[in-house]
A protein has these predicted regions:
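Active-site helix of classical SDR
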Residues: 123, 159
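Conserved glycine-rich cofactor-binding loop
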Residues: 8, 15-16
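Conserved glycine-rich Rossmann-like NAD(P)H-binding loop of the short-chain dehydrogenase/reductase
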Residues: 29-46
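Residue(s) in the substrate-gating loop at a strand-loop-helix junction
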Residues: 143
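Substrate-binding pocket helix/loop in short-chain dehydrogenase/reductase
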Residues: 99-112
Length: 272
């Protein structure tokens, strides 16, 4: 029997990419779902398909996580009506590429609110009932950018570093109360993130599929790992960075961006 069969998972940013793959793979494993993103119409079409294919319950919550009221709204429509969440997947987020001083400040502050503030708020809301039940788990979608500062992705890499260290600390706080916390750190993945952000030419390595990334994330939390790097090449790079001065890794990343002549000002997409 599947580890997730009969359990209920909440996936944020579920309309595209990694979030959509989390929803599809969890439903295929027999999990009931609550899926949320701004695009309610797309979510409702997904929900109908998943219900038909896998005979699971799928609830749709249209919510903009840039709205401070959204985490409470999502909580009220799940735990608040007797639908306990066994797994929270904090996936919603976005990135931007460009010189920090040239990128719009309001968008960079929105990035912090979505990638960090909403993630913390949702974790705080849903962790409490998990701890009371002494059962559950949270997956935070971070990035390989969490392991060093990334020039031209300065705010984005900083938000993902927060997600990683927050997850590692929370995992230890919760381990004796039978709640698992895990950070999933993917590298280049075949979503629309790089294309819209203007970085599609940056990495010539073979990207992973969202399904490969999600499989790694689910395996990690099932095994109680506090973080996992998805993909052998990404694991090698993340491991090797431990042996180099931080300034070396940061400057190497800057040279790579300059080599590919990325736009010095631009916007990235929301992952959800």
């Amino acid at each position: 029997m599947s580890y997730w069969r009969g359990k209920r998972a909440l996936v944020t940013g579920a309309s595209f990419g990694i979030g959509e793959s989390f929803a599809r793979m969890l439903a295929a494993s027999g999990a009931h779902l609550v899926i949320t993103a701004r695009s309610r119409e797309r979510l409702e079409a997904m929900a109908r398909k998943l219900q038909e294919d896998h005979s699971v319950e799928v609830d749709v919550v249209g919510a903009d996580l840039l709205d401070d009221a959204a985490p409470q709204q999502i909580y009220d429509l799940t735990e608040g009506v007797g639908k306990p969440i066994d797994l929270l997947v904090n996936n919603a987020g976005f990135g931007m590429v460009g010189d920090f001083d040239l990128l719009p400040l309001d968008r960079q502050l929105e990035m912090i609110r979505l990638n960090v503030t909403s993630l913390v708020a949702l974790s705080h809301k849903f962790l409490k009932p998990m701890l009371a039940r002494q059962s559950g788990g949270i997956i935070h979608v971070a990035s390989t950018a969490a392991f060093q500062g990334v020039p031209y992705f300065a705010v984005y890499s900083a938000t993902k570093a927060f997600v990683l260290t927050f997850s590692e600390a929370l995992a230890v706080e919760c381990e004796e109360r039978n709640v698992r916390i895990s950070a999933l750190c993917p590298g280049r993945t075949t979503t629309n993130f790089q294309q819209v952000a203007g970085t599609s030419s940056l990495d010539t390595s073979n990207p992973q599929t969202p399904e490969e990334v999600v499989r790694k994330g689910l395996e990690a939390i099932e095994k109680g790992k506090s973080h996992v790097v998805s993909g052998a090449q990404n694991q090698t790079v993340a491991f090797a960075e431990r042996f180099f001065p931080r300034a070396f890794a940061t400057k190497a990343a800057a040279r790579l961006y300059r080599r590919f002549k990325l736009p010095r000002e631009g916007n990235g997409p929301e992952e959800a």
